[in-house]
């Protein structure tokens, strides 16, 4: 696996994009005509969904990837499994894993890495600078909103058990950029919480990925949960839902996500 961008890209390379933010960056760079396929998480822009889908980024099969005959695979960090990457390397396919992170600087690094893998470094510098300036403006505006609301990001509630974000996650990163305070700081990653722990966190806002459907019914069900029913968020009905890729992708659209979340947090403050 090539970590970084030492690949010598060719204009006629058949490129496979793995990871929604990688695909977005390729489109933002104007290099989409080189794409031959994408992974399941690559749902934006909408036209990307017309490309063949080789499967979920963390559960790729060698057969699925090889079926689209790529010369170059550009993947988000965490793509795999490792056994699949080993097979692709043995098949002499260039595999570039781009760095990931959950802050402003990391987005620029990711854009530059994708651009370098494609051999369009200058365009990458321009895009990185444009996104960075836009994000700096959005972040500064979000920081003027007053007392940061305590935000609990819930990844899932399967079986009534709340799986929440701690630190060092995309959710924690976007909450901070948008002027919020992550309610959970006791652990890294995503872990289940006891009902008592959720109640003690006293979140002002519940943040979730938008999975479509009837939100009014979903909100009622959410706040009927014993752990959430007495929280400040339940008392004000403050739940914010956003498309998962927009919110957690950390790519060219992150300034848009920050502005939308900041506005939602302002509304929650009243």
Which residues does each predicted region cover?
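Bacterial N-terminal signal peptides
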Residues: 1-3
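Sec/Tat signal peptide C-region and signal peptidase I cleavage site
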Residues: 5-9
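Extracytoplasmic substrate-binding proteins
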Residues: 10-14, 83-159, 181-186, 237-270
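A short, structured surface patch at a secondary-structure boundary
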Residues: 14-68, 72-79, 83
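Short secondary-structure boundary segments
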Residues: 19, 77-78, 100, 155, ...
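Short helices/loops that flank or line small-molecule/ion binding pockets
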Residues: 63-69, 193-202
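A ligand-binding cleft/hinge motif common to bilobed small-molecule-binding domains
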Residues: 81-90, 205-223
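His/Asp/Glu-enriched short active-site or ligand-binding loop at hydrolase and phosphoryl-transfer sites
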Residues: 165-190, 210, 241
């Amino acid at each position: 696996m090539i970590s970084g961008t030492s690949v010598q890209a060719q204009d006629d390379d058949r490129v496979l994009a793995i990871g929604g933010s990688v695909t977005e960056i390729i489109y933002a760079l104007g290099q989409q005509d080189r794409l031959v396929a994408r992974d399941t998480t690559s749902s934006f822009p909408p036209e990307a969904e017309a490309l063949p889908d080789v499967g979920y980024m963390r559960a790729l099969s060698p057969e699925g990837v090889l079926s689209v005959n790529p010369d170059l695979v550009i993947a988000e960090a965490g793509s795999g499994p490792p056994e699949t990457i080993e097979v692709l390397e043995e098949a002499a396919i260039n595999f570039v894993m781009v760095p990931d992170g959950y802050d402003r600087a990391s987005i620029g690094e990711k854009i530059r890495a994708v651009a370098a893998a494609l051999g369009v470094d200058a365009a990458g510098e321009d895009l990185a600078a444009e996104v960075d300036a836009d994000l700096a403006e959005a972040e500064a505006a979000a920081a003027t909103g007053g007392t940061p609301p305590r935000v609990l990001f819930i990844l899932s509630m399967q079986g009534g058990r709340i799986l929440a974000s701690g630190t060092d996650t995309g959710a924690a990163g976007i909450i901070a950029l948008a002027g919020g305070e992550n309610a959970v700081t006791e652990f890294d990653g995503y872990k289940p919480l006891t009902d008592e722990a959720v109640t003690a966190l006293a979140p002002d806002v519940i943040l979730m990925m938008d999975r479509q459907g009837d939100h009014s019914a979903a909100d009622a069900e959410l706040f009927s949960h014993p752990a959430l029913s007495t929280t400040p968020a339940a008392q004000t009905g403050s739940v914010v839902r956003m498309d998962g890729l927009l919110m957690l992708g950390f790519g060219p659209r992150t300034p848009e996500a920050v502005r939308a979340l900041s506005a939602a947090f302002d509304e929650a403050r009243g």
